[in-house]
């Protein structure tokens, strides 16, 4: 399982939100490229970037920062989400050296777009499913739909999606542990690899995720915990690598 540091971008800075609320943000750095360097030096094998402004506006806003990080680390797999709602945007990021694009809102509102994107950019597409009480949320989590996460995830199995990033909104930024039972259930219900996100606080939470014995869970995204020092990236990755269960 990969430990994936998150860099959330808002107005060009690296921030963390609580439960997806833009008005409840903490700025951790005005230099996201240097922050990326910190996690790379800490031994991370993949980075998770989110354009928060883009998620709300429906198009990239912090794209220059994303491109700068991708150019600085050409051999590091980088995944970007937030405001990706057109093939042109995907093409822009892929050409900039980004490994994966995360389709969220558009995947819910127009699921056929995912198949289209996978066909145009095979191996590059991740679907981001953000949920509240098992129902998918969209538009920067501002809207909660009537669509159930597992039902939607199954729909994408034939499309060639590389992974699903599953975030439990109630847990995100709260550092109270991620929703392990539902994450494991999602991984069991679909053939698509699942990346857990939201709420990881410390090594104990990583162990709980591994103890779920869900082979479909291939990664864990962590944000506030690594910024506030309750989780060390290198230590957590070593723990995953050596985990025997």
UniProtKB/Swiss-Prot annotation:
It is found in: Cytoplasm. One of its GO terms (cellular component) is cytoplasm. The active site is at 8 (proton acceptor), 130 (proton donor). GO terms for biological process: L-histidine biosynthetic process; L-tryptophan biosynthetic process. Its EC number is 5.3.1.16. Pfam families: His_biosynth. It comes from the Bacteria. It is an enzyme of class 5 (isomerase). InterPro entries: Aldolase_TIM, His_biosynth, HisA_bact_arch, Isoase_HisA-like, Isoase_HisA-like_bact, RibuloseP-bd_barrel. It catalyses: 1-(5-phospho-beta-D-ribosyl)-5-[(5-phospho-beta-D-ribosylamino)methylideneamino]imidazole-4-carboxamide = 5-[(5-phospho-1-deoxy-D-ribulos-1-ylimino)methylamino]-1-(5-phospho-beta-D-ribosyl)imidazole-4-carboxamide. Keywords: Amino-acid biosynthesis, Cytoplasm, Histidine biosynthesis, Isomerase. Disulfide bonds: none annotated. GO terms for molecular function: 1-(5-phosphoribosyl)-5-[(5-phosphoribosylamino)methylideneamino]imidazole-4-carboxamide isomerase activity. Pathway: Amino-acid biosynthesis; L-histidine biosynthesis; L-histidine from 5-phospho-alpha-D-ribose 1-diphosphate: step 4/9. Belongs to the HisA/HisF family. This is 1-(5-phosphoribosyl)-5-[(5-phosphoribosylamino)methylideneamino] imidazole-4-carboxamide isomerase. It comes from Pseudomonas putida (strain W619).
């Amino acid at each position: 399982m990969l430990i994936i540091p998150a860099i959330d971008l808002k107005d060009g800075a690296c921030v963390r939100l609580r439960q997806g609320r833009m008005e409840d943000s903490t700025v951790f750095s005005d230099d996201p490229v240097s922050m990326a360097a910190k996690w790379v030096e800490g031994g991370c094998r993949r980075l998770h970037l989110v354009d928060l402004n883009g998620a709300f506006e429906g198009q990239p806003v912090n794209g220059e920062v994303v491109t700068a990080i991708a150019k600085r680390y050409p051999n590091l797999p980088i995944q970007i989400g937030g405001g990706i709602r057109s093939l042109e945007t995907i093409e822009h990021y892929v050409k900039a050296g980004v490994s994966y694009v995360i389709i969220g809102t558009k995947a819910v509102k127009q699921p056929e777009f995912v198949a289209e994107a996978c066909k145009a950019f095979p191996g590059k597409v991740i679907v981001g499913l953000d949920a509240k009480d098992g129902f998918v949320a969209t538009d920067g989590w501002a809207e909660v739909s009537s669509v159930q996460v597992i039902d939607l995830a199954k729909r994408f199995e034939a499309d060639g999606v590389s992974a699903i990033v599953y975030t439990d909104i109630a847990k995100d930024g709260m550092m109270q542990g991620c929703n392990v039972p539902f994450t494991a259930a999602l991984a069991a219900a679909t053939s698509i690899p699942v990346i857990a996100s939201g709420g990881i606080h410390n090594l104990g939470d990583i162990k709980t995720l591994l103890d779920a014995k869900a082979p479909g869970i291939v990664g864990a995204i962590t944000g506030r915990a690594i910024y506030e020092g309750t989780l060390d990236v290198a230590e957590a990755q070593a723990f995953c690598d050596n985990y025997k269960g």
